Amino acid sequence: MSRIFGTDGVRGLANGLLTAELAMELSQAAAIVLGHRHAPEGQRPTAVVARDGRASGEFIGAAVTAGLASSGVDVYDAGVLPTPAAAYLVGDIDADFGVMISASHNPAPDNGIKFLAHGGKKLPDAVEDTIQQVYEAKDFVRPTGAEVGRVTRLSDAEDRYILHLVGAIPHRLDGLSIVLDCANGAASGASPDAFRDAGATVHVIGAEPDGLNINDGVGSTHLGPLKQAVRELGADLGIAHDGDADRCLAVDHTGTEVDGDQIMCILAVAMKEAGRLNQDTLVATVMSNLGLQLALDEAGITLVRASVGDRYVLESMVANGYNLGGEQSGHVIMADYATTGDGLLTGLMLASRVAQTGMPLQELARTMTRMPQVMINVKNVDKAAAKTSEPVLEAVARTEERLGAEGRVLLRPSGTEPVVRVMVEAATHEDARREAEQLVSAVEEHLSLQS
């Protein structure tokens, strides 16, 4: 059987790939791998289960809970919550593991299952592979009588999380007017409450979830409504989440987007000033803009680049003791307070920096100037040879030499298709386009699969 787990758990069409049967049996397997193999003898393991509000989350959540409880795991049902809230609760109540039911920024018909290790951390690939092996073997445990798991509603789950968030920010938000776009998702209740508790005047859009409208024309993948609301209301800034609120993008008072790279730059500078940025280092990915590198160099901050995916950012952070990292898409990990990307925490910290400095977000964002970027997908090519083909590597080297310190080149093979993504950043858009097209020609000439 091919690997069930993708880059962020199991994800697909609910009742298509992701059936109730699959959800229950994966949970039975996780009960063994994450629960019984670690819990003290004679003690039932515990797990937190949460979901993001999609209609399908109700039956998938029921299947997950059934799989866990029937395997002798005590379940704390946290209801509809952001992914980072579920991760926080796993650590807060010292559960053995957690399960988040969400498809993040995907449309409503999709759903997903993400297992969280003890402490709320994402699972390494090897542990996911072990869960799949147990799932395929169908060698589940089936306790009876007093050994079956019990299900408890965690009624104060959201309140615990909000208290944690508000307690983390270094400066209150009194006097700030903020528009929140909750993507009709899991943060529709928690985010407005957290920002209000922190002192902000809050206006909310995209906070009327009906199970079918998550990410539908709102949220971090659709910033138009937020930009319009900020301008019309004369707000200081806007914050957008995705469906499970593990990411955050922002707009300034003019409605101009502030992306994940800019947010990380603002937070890194703030943390360095406060003496709280471990080793004066930020972890981003190979996709982060060269402008971030240049701005951090100016601020005396080291940029470490990881592979694309917040899990790889986190792996680098944990391995080296760094405490700030993230992606251009708005996944920002602040390891002093969270084990995963947290859109609410990120938004609160960003707003706190605005309040602390008295500077508009527009001015803070100018710390970093985004370099013009051109990305072209080259199809039907031998993606495996992209990093070994001598003519292609020579073309890349020539491009890098021409661009010098004011440009950057990245050839990134697709994980699922015979495609190589050619990305070039340069001082001008025209330079980036010209150099990218030359590289595309080299890739097509030397890596084409067509006979």
UniProtKB/Swiss-Prot annotation:
Q: Which domain of life is it from?
A: Bacteria
* PTM notes: Activated by phosphorylation.
The Swiss-Prot or TrEMBL record lists the needed cofactor(s) as: Mg(2+)
Q: Using the record's annotations, give every residue carrying the modification Phosphoserine.
A: 104
Listed A to Z, the keywords are: Isomerase, Magnesium, Metal-binding, Phosphoprotein
User: What does the note under cofactor report?
Assistant: Binds 1 Mg(2+) ion per subunit.
Tell me which InterPro entries the record gives. Answer: A-D-PHexomutase_a/b/a-I, A-D-PHexomutase_a/b/a-I/II/III, A-D-PHexomutase_a/b/a-II, A-D-PHexomutase_a/b/a-III, A-D-PHexomutase_C, A-D-PHexomutase_C_sf, A-D-PHexomutase_CS, Alpha-D-phosphohexomutase_SF
Quick one: a GO cellular component term? cytosol
Q: What class of enzyme is it?
A: isomerase
Q: Give the annotated active site.
A: 104 (phosphoserine intermediate)
Q: Which residues bind Mg(2+)?
A: 104, 242, 244, 246
The task this protein performs is described as:
Catalyzes the conversion of glucosamine-6-phosphate to glucosamine-1-phosphate.
Q: What is this protein called?
A: Phosphoglucosamine mutase
- What is the source species? Kocuria rhizophila (strain ATCC 9341 / DSM 348 / NBRC 103217 / DC2201)
What gene is this protein a product of?
Answer: glmM
